[in-house]
UniProtKB/Swiss-Prot annotation:
Organism encoding this protein: Pyrenophora tritici-repentis (strain Pt-1C-BFP)
Record Pfam families: Neugrin (PF06413)
Region (Disordered): 43-80, 225-250
Protein name: Required for respiratory growth protein 9, mitochondrial
Cellular localization per UniProt: Mitochondrion
Primary residence: mitochondrion
Record: transit peptide: 1-40
Amino acid sequence: MSCHNCSRTALGLFIRSLTNIQPAFAACRPLIHPQSLRFLSDARRPRRVDQSASRPDGVKPDTEIEDELSGEGFPRKRERPAWAIQKEALKEKLGGEAWNPRKKLSPDTMEGIRHLNSTQPDKFTTPVLAEHFKVSPEAIRRILKSNWKPSDKEYEERMERWNKRGERIWSNLVEMGVKPPKRWRDMGVGRARNGDVPRWKSRERNLVDVKDSASSDFTEYIPDEDIIPTVGKESKSKPTTSSIPLSERL
């Protein structure tokens, strides 16, 4: 029995050697799995596929994408930034016109607008007031409709700011030889020190052209208080009295 098994094993080994089959002891060897390389070469490095070459001509990447199942094209949704949405809404609101920010009027100016319209409504109409104060007619209509009045504390603070502003402006005009009104002289504006003559009494007086902020349409309007003047932009000095001949002065 053992001789038969030995002859059969020897015959099997002989046949395997002729047919280039793996040796009989190959199954007993440990299997060694090849390890992956730590660093990839240029040949094995993954490359990014360029989709522009496979895209058909005339199709933009962000416009339409064709559905493979239905065969219909649908637009790709892209979120727009907030500033772009606001810009488009503002453009539609303005009707294509340029952006012109609103001019902020002081409470005293708005009160003066209401006073002008109430005293002479035929002369100081809404278009005239809008043209003079450089605001829209709709803003003038809202000012005329409003009945807001400041409190006593707000009125006192506003008058204090107004007096400081007028004192600062008239102090600068005194240095240019302009005589301040009696109200500001009583407050000490233009008062000379150490017995000197005020500048508005010297030869260097009235060197600038001073006018109020009202135009020709407002010449007949008599304000309740003094108007703070503005200096003309022409930078032309007015002739002094000493340079005018006596015959012309008389």
